[in-house]
């Protein structure tokens, strides 16, 4: 067997330190150090303080972090109601009639959110959630204050910097830190926990679209941003007092090595207290946080996770899942008005006010996040993710038909259905990453995968707007079907690509890290068993291979096909785990990782 991949981290570190120049070496070393240590190390005093929340007045209970996380995410989700500000800002700030620019602010904010999550992920993982969360909310508030100044001065560039960049940085830090804190408390139901947390973010447009509409109608724009920012800051400041990390030993150290038949089990009442339970005063009569039973785990470093092809296949699948609704969310009022309202060739009132449609879309966004996350706990992350992509493919096929037959309710129903899938992707992706790469890598992996959000919001949004503007400049009207058929066509192709990528994601730790033979060409799992294709050179196997019995084998002049038995697979897997454990211990003793 070839176990060269076991020492990849050592090789990665050594090669990185042989760059040209001492300054470059120092920079590379700093970056490697930053992304190599992603675990929060609490002192004994901090663990003791975390037994109480809300300024030390209330004993912490695991359930408290979920409503606190929902409220915080709900405030951050106000960004989803940005479309209400587009027309008023364009009318106030536009430099020429018909010029649109406010929409770009939304794309910049979500783009910066993803980049901030990627850069700050390791820092968030290593720090207390109240610290990172407080920084996120302060920066988010500063973005609102800058936006108020920008609209007062009628400067689009300052608006892009204030709400787009500054508030986007606050969004990135606050979004990732809140989800990470909630996710760590519930190792047995990560999909449900993370879905509940991000449910608040998806529901932001549900309330804030109506609130923003009221502010626009009853105040001037600078005051609207001052009120909105101050209100969300005050609510988050109180809610974050209930956020704290779980006690030591609450989560498995690494990725749990499981068989498909294994399930989580609660500790029996007479089981001895774990270190985590003792740290939180697990005395008689005091319910301790539920603990998973002890199982074998496999430590996966962040560099291993990021160099895994499965991570990047999931990255493409995630990007594909969000791009459709992401461009629709910021353009829904315009779509309704152009296709079914006053912007039509024959103007009429739309069947539903646009701000209500945005609010209902937020409700479906919120519903999808929690329901899909919970469903993934029951039937598996990969299966559910494939279903989300498939539903969106069907939606994109029928949306142009709904537009062509002038059916508003069919159109809006399809959009809301896709919105459930959009929210569901966000709800389950933190749990998907934690299952695949370990809880200590979740913030970093989640932050980096959120750059797909950046790409989808900036590139996808700009492409959508660019297609519309190109048709308009060529003499088309905003109600012309061909504008939207063209846009939906390229989005459909992207989602199909994402579906194919998701098919090839190896969600199981065994499938990802099962040892490969030196002469192995490819490997896949068929009906629960490993099927391998081995190369044959000059009539001999391309590498040393030990005799195997019991497996089905077919040998030709160039390749050998092998279908392993369950027993052979288990033997090879146990040998790999044993070697991996020895390697990890040696590396730890040498202080390399």
Give residue spans per PLM region.
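Intracellular juxtamembrane helix-capping segments at the cytosolic ends
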Residues: 89, 171-186, 193-194, 336, ...
């Amino acid at each position: 067997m070839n176990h060269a991949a076991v020492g990849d981290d050592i090789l990665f570190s050594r090669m990185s330190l042989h760059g040209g120049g001492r300054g470059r070496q120092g920079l590379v070393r700093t970056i490697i150090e930053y992304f190599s240590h992603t675990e929060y190390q609490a002192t004994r005093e901090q663990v003791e303080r975390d037994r109480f929340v809300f300024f030390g007045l209330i004993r912490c209970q695991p359930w408290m972090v979920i409503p606190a996380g929902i409220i915080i995410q709900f405030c951050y989700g106000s960004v989803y109601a940005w479309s209400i500000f587009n027309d008023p800002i364009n009318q106030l700030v536009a430099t020429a009639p018909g010029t649109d620019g406010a929409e770009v602010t939304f794309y910049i904010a979500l783009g910066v959110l993803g980049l901030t999550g990627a850069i700050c992920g390791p820092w968030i993982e290593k720090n207390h959630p109240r610290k990172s969360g407080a920084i996120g909310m302060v920066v988010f508030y500063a973005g609102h204050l800058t936006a108020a100044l920008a609209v007062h001065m009628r400067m689009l560039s300052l608006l892009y910097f204030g709400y787009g960049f500054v508030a986007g940085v606050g969004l990135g830090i606050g979004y990732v830190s809140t989800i990470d804190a909630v996710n760590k408390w519930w190792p047995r139901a990560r999909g449900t926990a993370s879905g509940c947390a991000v449910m608040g973010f998806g529901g932001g447009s549900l309330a804030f679209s109506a609130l923003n509409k009221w502010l626009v109608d009853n105040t001037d724009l600078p005051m609207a941003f001052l009120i909105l920012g101050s209100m969300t800051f005050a609510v988050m400041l109180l809610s974050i007092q209930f956020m704290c990390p779980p006690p030591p030993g609450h989560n498995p150290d690494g990725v749990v090595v499981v068989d498909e038949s294994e399930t989580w089990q609660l500790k029996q009442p007479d089981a001895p207290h774990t270190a985590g339970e003792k740290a939180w005063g697990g005395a008689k009569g005091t319910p301790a946080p539920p603990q998973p039973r002890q199982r074998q785990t496999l430590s996966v470093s962040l560099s291993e996770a990021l160099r895994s092809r499965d991570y990047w296949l999931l990255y493409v699948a995630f990007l594909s899942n969000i791009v459709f609704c992401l461009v629709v969310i910021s353009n829904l009022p315009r779509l309704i008005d152009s296709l079914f309202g006053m912007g039509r060739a024959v103007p009429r009132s739309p069947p539903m006010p646009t701000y209500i449609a945005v609010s209902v879309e937020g409700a479906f966004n919120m519903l999808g996040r929690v329901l899909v996350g919970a469903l993934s706990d029951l039937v598996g992350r990969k299966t559910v993710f494939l279903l989300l992509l498939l539903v969106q493919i069907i939606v994109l096929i029928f949306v142009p038909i709904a537009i062509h037959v002038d059916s508003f309710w069919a159109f809006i129903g399809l959009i809301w259905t896709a919105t459930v899938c959009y929210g569901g992707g966000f709800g389950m992706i933190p749990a998907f990453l934690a299952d695949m790469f370990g809880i200590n890598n979740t913030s970093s992996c989640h932050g980096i995968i959120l750059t797909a959000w950046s790409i989808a919001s900036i590139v996808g949004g700009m492409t959508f707007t660019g297609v519309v503007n190109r048709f308009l400049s060529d003499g088309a009207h905003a109600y012309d079907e061909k504008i939207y058929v063209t846009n939906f066509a390229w989005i459909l192709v992207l989602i199909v690509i994402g579906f194919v990528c998701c098919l090839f994601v190896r969600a199981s730790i065994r499938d990802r890290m099962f040892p490969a033979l030196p002469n192995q060409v490819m490997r896949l799992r068929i009906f629960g068993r490993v099927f391998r294709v081995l190369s044959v050179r000059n009539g001999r196997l391309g590498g040393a291979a030990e005799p195997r019995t019991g497996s089905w084998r077919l040998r030709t002049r160039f390749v050998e096909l092998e279908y392993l038995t369950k027993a052979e697979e288990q033997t090879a897997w146990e040998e790999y785990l044993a070697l991996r454990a020895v390697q990890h211990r040696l590396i730890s003793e040498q202080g390399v990782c």
